[in-house]
Amino acid sequence: MSSSNPFVSIVDDDLATTKLFHEALSENIHNVRVVSFTDPVLGLEHFSENKDVYALVIADLRMPSLNGLELLKKVKTSNPKVRTILMSAYNFDEDLLFLKYMEEGIIDSAIDKPVTMNILFQRVTDELQASQLTRAK
């Protein structure tokens, strides 16, 4: 794996989820550097220091100190080319801020938890392909 490969970040305060997703993506998605954080503030700091080599940020909706919506808004404001996935065990359809951010392109995709690995891989692959197209422009 080259240090020029883009980052894919998983940010979820649940350590078991973070570890599972990190291992699964590291083993199955190639040509990326997978990093994971249980503290959204640390995840945002890493992104800020490396924002030009990020392809994708996957964030859980409900986290202490900085929720997924706030985190992904900061990510997109800092680098609009980075793709974003919001995941949650809660219903997105009634969250007006979520709907607004989807419409504005702050959130590129959403995943309902629990999620199968097949759905996770497909969504991540789709967003990485979109990232390559965006970064090529």
Give short role names for the model-derived ranges.
Residues 12, 60:
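Active-site residues of response regulator receiver
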Residues 45, 69-81, 100:
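Short amphipathic alpha-helix used as the core "switch/output" element in two-component signaling
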Residues 63:
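Receiver (REC) domain active-site loop signature in two-component systems and cognate sites
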Residues 70, 91-110, 118, 122:
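Alpha4 helix (beta4-alpha4-beta5 surface) of REC/receiver domains from two-component response regulators
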Residues 113:
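A Lys-centered signature of the CheY-like receiver
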